Amino acid sequence: MAFTVYDCHEDIRNILVTPQIRARFCRLEPGSGSLDFGHTHDLGHEIFIILEGRVEFQISGNVNELGPGQMCYALVDEPHSVRVIGEEPVLMYLSVTPHIQPTHTFYDDDRNRRPPHFRPSSDYNTETDSTTPMDEIIDRHVDTARELYECARENLATQEAQAALLKRALTDDDLETANAIRETMWLPQLELFKQMHTTADVWNTLAPRAGSVNAHY
């Protein structure tokens, strides 16, 4: 099956946007950006890879210069900002995982958290579902939350039932039994994580229509 190849010179946009990840190419012009306190992500780790040009990144108060072929990252709750240095435009890849609204947390001049900053889906180069009635989306959101709860209950029951068996197998150095128990423990966790992604997907559909939104920064 064919797949799409993307080019950092032509596809300057969000390319992949799912609850698991948001990935994009960016172009930053000379003189743009600043090393202010910046913003944070409540849930997401963000990775930056410089493809062309040079920048300075500020992450949690520390500043470093990056050039082509270099990367850095900002973890959850780490304030970060960037500015271009030199006369050359910057091409950069970035990804944030996971991608769940509200994606950015901003701060006032005293570094106090501002209210949640929900954004329209168009900010991420995706379309908001504007045709499905909101009552239906809200009901779907509640249904997926309930399914997540049931998955969590089933997962907990399995982990509790298998924990002592796994301890015994490892104590006895019985790796064959331990391998089988580990697989038994993994399967309900797999379903739990899948349901978490489904729940996040419905939430990302609900959030832009559930109140006011603020475009861009």
What are the roles of these predicted feature ranges?
Residues 2-38, 44, 95-104:
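A short glycine-rich, His/Asp/Glu-containing loop-to-beta-strand
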Residues 18, 60-77:
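Short acidic-glycine-tyrosine-enriched beta hairpin
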Residues 43, 62, 78-79, 88:
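A generic "binding-loop/recognition-motif" signal
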Residues 43-55, 69:
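Glycine- and acidic-residue-biased ligand/ion/polar-headgroup-sensing regions
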Residues 57-58, 74, 80-86:
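Short beta-strand His + acidic residue motifs that chelate non-heme Fe in jelly-roll/DSBH
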Residues 85-149:
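Double-stranded beta-helix
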Residues 130-185, 189:
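Long, charged, low-complexity terminal extensions
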Residues 168-217:
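C-terminal non-catalytic accessory extensions
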